[in-house]
Amino acid sequence: MDHDAILEKVISVVNDTLEVPADVELTEETAFKDLGADSFDLLELVTALEDEFDLTFDDEALEKIATVGDAVSAIEAAQ
């Protein structure tokens, strides 16, 4: 799966999981904390991403996921 396809799926999962308002446009630079996500929300998001992409993030990758782009990079590295 190429970068743009992964990005599109990540944005979809983020929108669904964090219930992002329709008027908010997500980019690779969007930080989850700026969307009001707390640690529970991030855990829920990571679980949803792992399910969507059928993978498991290692602890090191989890510590680095703070933005949409970070999530895309972690998925690319895990595939």
Can you describe what each PLM-predicted range is?
Residues 1-23, 78:
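Thiotemplate assembly-line natural product biosynthesis machinery
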Residues 9, 45-48, 74:
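Generic alpha-helical secondary-structure signal
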Residues 17-34, 54-61:
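Phosphopantetheine carrier-protein modules
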Residues 31, 67-69:
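Short, structural beta-strand-to-alpha-helix junction motif
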Residues 39:
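Catalytic nucleophile serine of serine hydrolases
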Residues 43-64:
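Phosphopantetheinylated carrier protein domains
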